[in-house]
Amino acid sequence: MRILGIDPGLRTTGFGVIEKHGNKLAYVASGTIKSDGNSTLPERLKTLYDGISEVSRTYAPDCAAIEKVFVNVNPQSTLLLGQARGAAICGLVGYGLPVFEYTALQLKVAVVGYGRANKAQVQEMVTRLLMLPGQPGSDAADALGVAICHANGSDTLGTLSGLAPDLVRKGMRVRRGRLVG
């Protein structure tokens, strides 16, 4: 399975492509899509949309994973990030890809094993997990991390969805991301 990970941003959007074969992950490509800060917002969003579309055509992924927006201290920044994320999702869906969403916390737990990991720790673990010769930039590393998060979680999600009816009958439910009974 080939997975395209996206770390959305209005100035710089990171992308990372990995392949999953059984339990093994293999690096395919990564990079960034940059928009001109002097352009209008609609032009910047189109640059992002076109870039995501081109990456999708070039690497032909089976699915995409994108980081969810977090609410920032500055509401204007959150709104702009949400618009950039929307443009990225439109580019992915326009290519016909199923899109999966993950929080920064899920990404950090999947890659580093610790939800409060910093960017340097994510970069280091992405480099190790994919056996890269050098560290990718922080945006590309986050995108690769989202792809790794999906690769690691897709088997678990499939298994859990098959078990869901049995667990419900036994009185089990998910609370705060944990299975409780």
Curated annotation (Swiss-Prot):
<dbReference type="Pfam" id="PF02075">
    <property type="entry name" value="RuvC"/>
</dbReference>
<keyword id="KW-0255">Endonuclease</keyword>
<dbReference type="GO" id="GO:0003677">
    <property type="term" value="F:DNA binding"/>
</dbReference>
<protein>
    <recommendedName>
        <fullName>Crossover junction endodeoxyribonuclease RuvC</fullName>
        <ecNumber>3.1.21.10</ecNumber>
    </recommendedName>
</protein>
<comment type="similarity">
    <text>Belongs to the RuvC family.</text>
</comment>
<keyword id="KW-0233">DNA recombination</keyword>
<dbReference type="InterPro" id="IPR020563">
    <property type="entry name" value="X-over_junc_endoDNase_Mg_BS"/>
</dbReference>
<feature type="active site">
    <location>
        <position position="139"/>
    </location>
</feature>
<comment type="subunit">
    <text>Homodimer which binds Holliday junction (HJ) DNA. The HJ becomes 2-fold symmetrical on binding to RuvC with unstacked arms; it has a different conformation from HJ DNA in complex with RuvA. In the full resolvosome a probable DNA-RuvA(4)-RuvB(12)-RuvC(2) complex forms which resolves the HJ.</text>
</comment>
<feature type="binding site">
    <location>
        <position position="7"/>
    </location>
    <ligand>
        <name>Mg(2+) 1</name>
    </ligand>
</feature>
<comment type="function">
    <text>The RuvA-RuvB-RuvC complex processes Holliday junction (HJ) DNA during genetic recombination and DNA repair. Endonuclease that resolves HJ intermediates. Cleaves cruciform DNA by making single-stranded nicks across the HJ at symmetrical positions within the homologous arms, yielding a 5'-phosphate and a 3'-hydroxyl group; requires a central core of homology in the junction. The consensus cleavage sequence is 5'-(A/T)TT(C/G)-3'. Cleavage occurs on the 3'-side of the TT dinucleotide at the point of strand exchange.</text>
</comment>
<keyword id="KW-0963">Cytoplasm</keyword>
<keyword id="KW-0238">DNA-binding</keyword>
<keyword id="KW-0479">Metal-binding</keyword>
<dbReference type="GO" id="GO:0000287">
    <property type="term" value="F:magnesium ion binding"/>
</dbReference>
<keyword id="KW-0234">DNA repair</keyword>
<dbReference type="InterPro" id="IPR012337">
    <property type="entry name" value="RNaseH-like_sf"/>
</dbReference>
<feature type="binding site">
    <location>
        <position position="139"/>
    </location>
    <ligand>
        <name>Mg(2+) 1</name>
    </ligand>
</feature>
<feature type="active site">
    <location>
        <position position="67"/>
    </location>
</feature>
<dbReference type="InterPro" id="IPR002176">
    <property type="entry name" value="X-over_junc_endoDNase_RuvC"/>
</dbReference>
<keyword id="KW-0460">Magnesium</keyword>
<dbReference type="InterPro" id="IPR036397">
    <property type="entry name" value="RNaseH_sf"/>
</dbReference>
<feature type="active site">
    <location>
        <position position="7"/>
    </location>
</feature>
<keyword id="KW-0540">Nuclease</keyword>
<keyword id="KW-0378">Hydrolase</keyword>
<dbReference type="GO" id="GO:0006310">
    <property type="term" value="P:DNA recombination"/>
</dbReference>
<dbReference type="GO" id="GO:0005737">
    <property type="term" value="C:cytoplasm"/>
</dbReference>
<keyword id="KW-0227">DNA damage</keyword>
<dbReference type="GO" id="GO:0006281">
    <property type="term" value="P:DNA repair"/>
</dbReference>
<feature type="binding site">
    <location>
        <position position="67"/>
    </location>
    <ligand>
        <name>Mg(2+) 2</name>
    </ligand>
</feature>
<dbReference type="GO" id="GO:0008821">
    <property type="term" value="F:crossover junction DNA endonuclease activity"/>
</dbReference>
<dbReference type="GO" id="GO:0048476">
    <property type="term" value="C:Holliday junction resolvase complex"/>
</dbReference>
